[in-house]
Amino acid sequence: MKLIKKIMISALFVLGFNSYNVSANAECGDITIANMNWASANFMAEVDKVILEEGFGCNVELIPGATMPTFTSMQEKGEPDVAPEFWANAAIVELEAAVKEGKLHSINKAPITGLGEGWWVLPATLEKHPDLTSADAILARPDLFPHPEDPSKGGFHICPPGWNCELSNRNHFRAWEMEKKGWAIVETGSAAGLDGSIAKAAERGENWCGYYWSPTSLVGKYNLQAVDMGEYAGKDNWDNCLSKPEQECANPKKSSWVKSEVFTVVSDNYKSTAGKAGMNYFKKRTYPGEVMNGMLVYMADQQADGADAAIEFLVRYPEVWSKWVPKSTADKIRKGIGL
């Protein structure tokens, strides 16, 4: 009889505990998060999942996505609820329209610090040649960056065929009159080819100059240094010339790279149902660039996926993520991941 009573009490305890969990989950609700198809976005989605589930009691589902398909789905269907790392340059006009209509909301316009595109060099180059402080100074020294196929010219590494940045870099090459200054384009052929050219130069102690972007594991691993390209020459020059095919850009002007607009975007449904705490989390959730690049290096070196990297980040950087949530929520997260 006592055994039966104990079993009944245990069952009631379990039912009560489960009811509490259901209640907590119901308060937060079901949330869908875009799991974009590049490393930093995958990592961010997994961190969001852990924090929302362990800290806020949400039910989180990650939805595979990419920039434009995810944007279209959020705009037309209101799903997924959250795009953690949305590179808005690809659809800035459409996003602004969706925000104006109240369908979407850009609630964090700096989810990662120090990100962007442009020209980069290796730190060893600047240590040996501290005078190379700008694009003009670098372009005056093609001899320091010999082209792999013609060492008499400087080698300027650009994006693989088919990438939008290939067009921009070819037009930049003309705008800066690089051929007259003794430079030639290095056709990298693929993402692996571009990455390999950087790794090879870094490991051999050679100089390298070309296009790249952050956050990426290579920027973190080799501490690539962004080149000062001067002033931005305006939206018309960028939108209607530099970003177009060469035949549509008759008179390109020198310019810094267009500012990368990267937001955390949420659906109107999420904004209406998430509650103040959930919205505040995404508004505060900003990764320092060096931390993000470091986590991408970890993912590359350890062949870790976003889920593994999320736990590693939460263990390694509590001083970063604990600022995004109330202390009581941070305590729940620590307990949930076994800290």
Locate the predicted segments by residue.
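C-terminal lobe and pocket-closing loops
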Residues: 221-286
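Short, polar/charged alpha-helical segment
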Residues: 40-58
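A bilobed periplasmic-binding-protein/Venus flytrap-type ligand-binding module shared by bacterial periplasmic
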Residues: 116-127, 259-274, 295-298
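Ligand-binding pocket segment of bilobal, Venus flytrap-like solute-binding proteins
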Residues: 72-74, 80-87, 157-238
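An extracytoplasmic/periplasmic, membrane-proximal ligand-sensing/linker region
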Residues: 40, 166-181, 191-205, 216-219, ...
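A conserved helix-loop-strand patch within extracytoplasmic ligand-binding domains
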Residues: 104-158
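Short, well-ordered beta-strand elements
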Residues: 27-40, 58-63, 153-157, 282
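Immediate post-signal peptide segment of exported/extracytoplasmic ligand-binding proteins
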Residues: 22-33, 145-153, 338-339
